[in-house]
């Protein structure tokens, strides 16, 4: 597989993706009956995930090979691996080259799948990025037409403005060392 994206999900879990399609995760897992954890690899696409062991290593190799053979721009559109999660594929391309959308966006401060809360509701922003002046930009990606996009954009922007006004992005490790513009604050 030529291009593997590695994403940190938590201090104990790392994701492996091909053009946005997660095919494996490495994690520390608690062992039953004690407080110790042990590393394990989980592979497959939900809901068909399984823990890697000696009995299914060949299946893991076949999965990686088959995804790598079809998940690229010229791949066969009828393949399930090619069609799966088109918005994640688009997101992976945008994050790799955020300046293709706008040359004022700063690739050093580009984050994907950023949680945004409002009361008890949790949403995931596809891409949150700072421009060169420190102003925040929300990028919401759609693989298909969506009549709700304008309302979703307003909702996400209000969430981002609220988090920014309270300094929560830096508090949770986003934009570390980057001074964000106060113009974003409501």
Give a label for each model feature.
Residues 1-186:
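Charged, terminal alpha-helix-loop-beta segments
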